[in-house]
């Protein structure tokens, strides 16, 4: 519990005494869009693969099955 308290106090201390940058961060929207599209494509391909994983197995014929008498 004391470690959590120390962590919270350190976070508050750093937030209060940190200076704002003169030049704020500027996003590179083109790279962000391309990265998002790649991530989405990989995620969708993984989901489709996971859903179809057991669907494409070949059917086996059980001619020697003794339980079908």
Curated annotation (Swiss-Prot):
Signal peptide extent: 1-22
Any one GO cellular component localisation term in the record: plasma membrane
Stretches in topological domain Cytoplasmic: 55-69
Subcellular location: Cell membrane
Chief site of localization: membrane
Effect of deleting the gene: Morpholino knockdown of the protein results in an increased number of sodium/potassium-transporting ATPase-expressing cells in larval skin.
One GO MF term attached to the UniProt entry: sodium channel regulator activity
Pfam families according to UniProt: ATP1G1_PLM_MAT8 (PF02038)
Annotated keywords: Cell membrane, Ion transport, Membrane, Signal, Transmembrane, Transmembrane helix, Transport
Membrane topology: Single-pass type I membrane protein
TM helices/strands, residue ranges: 34-54
Family to which this protein belongs: Belongs to the FXYD family.
Primary role: May modulate the activity of a sodium/potassium-transporting ATPase.
The protein's name: FXYD domain-containing ion transport regulator 11
Organism from which the protein derives: Danio rerio (Zebrafish)
